Amino acid sequence: MHNFTNWTNALNPTRFATRLNSFASGAHIAWPGQSGKPSVMQMAERAASVEGLTDLDLNYPDHVSEDPAELSRKLGDLGLSINGFAMRYYTNPAFKLGAFTHPAEDVRRDAIDLTKKGIDAAREAGSNLMTIWLGQDGFDYAFQADYAKMWQHEIDGIREVCEHDTDCLISIEYKPNEPRSYSLMPDAATTLLAIKEVGARNLGVTLDFAHVLYADEQPAFAAALIARHSRVLGVHLNDGYAKRDDGLMVGAVHTLQTVELLRQIRRDGYEGAIYFDTFPDLTGLDPVHECEVNIRTVQRMLKVVDRLEQDNRLASAIDRQDSVSTQAIVQELMFGADY
C-alpha cells in the first residue's frame, strides 16, 4: 500500500502504472481469430510483457467482475501490482445527467453506494487509492441547474465516500469538460475549493497532464498549488495540443512542461506511481511498444531532473525570474552544450 504521510522521500522512478484498456489495441493481431473484446486477464497478460511496468490501475466496476483479492493474486502472478482503482459511472443510464449531482436522490444514492463498493473492492485487492473522475457531474445549458444546490450535492457526496473508509485515499481527477459541456470539477482551483469544503484528511488530487493543459494551466504550477493546499495523490502522464484529451505519448508535444512537472512533484515529495493515461487504442498503435517508450521517456526525463537539481545556475536564474537563462540552462542540460 502507498504511504503518503512521509513527504521527505523523492519520487520513486521505478513504479510505472498504465491504463489497462490500452492493451485492447490491435486485438486482432494479439488474439487472431478471437471475436469480441479481450478479457481483463488477456489485457493484463499483454501488459505484463511491457519491460519496466510494475502496476495497473483498474476501473470499477468495469474490470472487477470477480473477487478482488483473487484478481489481485492473478495479477501478482503476472508480476503486476494494483496501483489503485478508478471509478466509472456508466452502469446506471441515469448517471448521464449526473452521478453525485443528479437531481434525483435515489440516483445520487446509487452513485455514492457504487463508489463505496468500489472502495471496499480496492481495499480487498490490497490497494488504498481510489480515483474519482466525476465527469458526469456538470451542466450543458444556461438555466439547467441550481448551481448552489448542485455544488452542495457534490460536496456531500465526496465527503460521504471519504468517510466510508478513512484509510483509503480518495483522489479527485479534474477535467474541464467532456462528457458534460461544463464540469463541476474543471481545474485545480475549483477542485481545491471543494477539498477545503469537504475537509477530509484522506482526500487529494490526481493531475492528468492533458486535462491540465486544456484547463489552460501550467502543470508544474498546478502541482505546486495542490501541494500547498492539499496533496497530489496521482499523476497521469500523457500529452496533447491543449484543446481536448488527446492521450498522446509522454513528451510528444510539451517536453519542457513535462520535465518541469516531474521536477515539481519530486520537490514536493510525491511518492506514487507514474501512470500512463494514453490512448494507443484510438489509432491501433502497438500498446506494448508504446508503453515501453513512455517508460523510457520518463526515465530519461528523471535523469534530466537530476541534472537540473544539481546545477546551481538554474536555481539562481529561477530566483531572478531570468527566463532567458533558465531556457539556456535547461536546453543545455537536456541536449548537451555542443552545437
Where do the language-model regions lie?
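Glycine-rich, proline-tolerant flexible connector loops at the mouths of alpha/beta enzymes
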Residues: 55-76, 138-142
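Histidine-acidic metal/acid-base catalytic patches
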Residues: 1-52, 120, 166, 185-207, ...
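Active-site beta-loop-alpha junctions enriched in small/polar residues
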Residues: 21-23, 59-63, 87-90, 135-137, ...
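A short acidic, helix-capping loop that chelates divalent metal ions and anchors anionic groups
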Residues: 26-29, 93-97, 138-143, 178-180, ...
